Design a protein with these regions (language model features):
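Pocket-edge positions in alpha/beta enzyme catalytic cores
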Residues: 48-51, 104-107, 127
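Conserved residues at the C-terminal ends of beta-strands
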Residues: 15, 88, 118
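Short runs of predominantly hydrophobic/aromatic residues within well-ordered alpha helices
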Residues: 2-5, 109-112, 154
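Glycine-rich, flexible loop segments associated with nucleotide phosphate handling
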Residues: 50-54, 92-96, 129-133
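An alpha-helical support segment within catalytic cores of ATP-dependent transferases
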Residues: 2, 7, 11-78, 144-148
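Active-site activation/catalytic loop segments of kinase-like enzymes and analogous catalytic loops
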Residues: 110-144, 156-162
């Protein structure tokens, strides 16, 4: 599954982002996050473990403090995780995508952050650290960049607002 997900991510990220009509870059998503805090729509009961108990204001302050200076724009799914990818069980080939409401041009780390978080879950019998490592190996075959741990952390934080 990790190899199929990596191939999907690589294919999406290889599309011409300049032709994508949907903007999910930080000039759009950070103000949306601030609006979510102001409206009280951030689900503070469903935060990642390292942020349990945080207020919306604290989340937003951390988001602003850690905002990356640059973006490696690509066409992104926006919520790339195994639950949103349909696979043929016989061939393990991707047959479709669901939950595509956040598709748009964004930093590729926004997809990488979410899929790697999901694949690394040790308590899930289907996944674990070896799955995220396999994903990175396969994804890296078609990309000359480097994964930024700081950006991964930032985009996981940004996901808390949506």
């Amino acid at each position: 599954m990790a190899v199929a997900l990596a191939g999907l991510a690589r294919s999406l990220h290889a599309l011409d982002w300049e032709r994508c009509p949907f903007d999910r870059s930080l000039v759009v998503t950070v103000p949306q996050a601030a609006r979510a805090v102001a409206e009280g729509s951030v689900d503070l009961e469903d935060l990642d473990e390292e942020r349990e108990g945080w207020s919306g204001e604290r989340l937003l302050a951390e988001l602003e403090r850690t905002r990356p200076a640059d973006e490696d724009l690509a066409v992104c799914h926006g919520d790339l995780c195994p639950d949103n990818v349909l696979l043929d069980p016989r061939t393990c080939e991707v047959t479709g995508l669901i939950d595509v409401g956040r598709v748009g041009r964004a930093d590729r780390h926004s997809d990488l952050a979410l899929v790697l978080r999901e694949l690394a879950h040790e308590e899930d019998p289907w996944f674990g650290p070896e799955c995220s490592a396999a994903f990175l190996r396969e994804y890296g075959r078609g990309w000359d960049g480097a994964v930024s741990e700081e950006k991964l952390a930032f985009y996981r934080l940004l996901d808390e607002f949506f």
